């Protein structure tokens, strides 16, 4: 292997392309360790999230209403708040409340490590989506199947374990696979709490070797490789476990919208009192964290409520900036994604392949990695005819978030157009309309209604993802939360209330979007 390492070292000297993670022993060891930690994080969170989904779906069928409400609250909380803030809340907030353990050398270590907190948080986040996925699979099982299990003397748990769950898994495998792929792409958020996964290691290497471009593209293609392998495995499992009459076999006669649309997860169904219960839960979280913290410190410092009231205008200003970033990213991404989606259906092979590749590339890339690419590779200013035009970090963040929006919007457009009955095209052709006229005057107006609900879901996900901009230094709500914490003397007892307030803001904003989306889905539902 040494000749290969020497060749890459000489390649760097000739071209300036510094692939230090290949020819340098120390960097290569760090990359390998980071990659396998990313792989471990992905595998463990996938397994735990599936277990959470299975347990939650079973509890949703409980006869006890308070259990069903707890599960509904759990789903609403984790699906309507940013996963990054959840990680911060668990690691910084709850982590401070737990006792520390002796390390045997006179020091102490946290009871739960940063890696363990990342696993817990990401597993619960993905598990909330899996609960709804398994529930939809269970609802697709004929009632006669459940009644047959009961008639054989099986208990409710036995019926669920041996009859319903195996069939439900086979029915919901496509949706489950999509969520697991999204989970793998989300694992890089562990970077924010210094888990030495692939992105964290890559940043250390480019800090030592100033090879930002090379390391960022390596991380991007490494995650694409993981996604490709996972998708291949899931497709193999799906083919092996396919049930005749469900999934693709059932939709061969006419393509259904759910078969061709991009898998943007929808928000959970919940009753009107759900939001009141969640608001009460957030108040309890803030109050509990503040009470325990004051009991531990025993000092008459400003309470968490006083700190929140004092700094609330600043924090809300930061939250408003998050919303502005999300709106701008959706606008830019949608404007770019519509023509790309139409291009995927073009009769020109080169255009069709090019737009398809671009869509899949940005759709399957981790959003945080795309954000890093835009922030670190785009210059901070441009010179045009001697005029310096600044390009601030917040503008780079908008561009970074607009790339996945473009890709997902492209898939929404392609899927919506394909779901229109072919008779619409034939009728327009009979009237003498050209292909472009048919698309503009007949197909796209019908497609808009079908695209709107998943497009709203996509916006909700983008709004929650804007907190990732805090990692690259954009001054938004989470960045200001850290500054408020520092201004209050970096008191660790304030972390749980501050991050709980951030979760509350996003929940209050995203939950109504989910309810509106459900209303749009019912209104624009495609009839079979």
What are these model-predicted stretches?
Residues 1-528:
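Transmembrane alpha-helices and adjacent helix-loop boundaries
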